[in-house]
Amino acid sequence: CEESQRVCTAFRQIGHEAYSCDVQECSGGHPEWHIQGDVLPYIDGSCIVTTMDGVEHRIDGTWDLLIAHPPCTYLSNAGARHLWKGHVLNQERYEKGLEGKAFFMRFLSADCPRICVENPVPSRIYELPKYTQTIQPYEYGHPYSKRTCLWLKNLPPLQPTDIVDPVGTWCPSGSYSHKHDAKHKGIFTKD
């Protein structure tokens, strides 16, 4: 999940040859840096990638750094409440979670010297490896809380750069808290 190209663009701005990859088209304005499709054929490097502008790029050897944002729909602790319906395991959702775990683990085991995998707090049922650290938006100048986990390989932990007081939880429009009527406003967010 890197269709926004925020990470890719940040690395390009400081001189790195970075690419984004997602099954969706990019929204960051740089199709010449975006590989649209499944990341798995390219994850270990030693490949030829074609960016959205139709240009082929040869990757010799492994990537220098892999930053991954795999889908969290079935893995996150927030989604765990959907696993049990009337005290019965939702088998379909559980199996989708196992597929999500296999995808997640492919990033952690990629042939790459430096790896960062980002995801929300995982549900314990899937037994993901222990994350290296957690970060919060308010540690980087954004006045919201949303605990995010990082699994790091050969990378130092991130250090806060601009700690501010959080004004509420980060919760985009259309998320759980916005599906309730006005009496629930403010319980999950400050909006």
Name what the model sees in each region.
Residues 1-191:
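Conserved active-site and SAM-binding loop architecture
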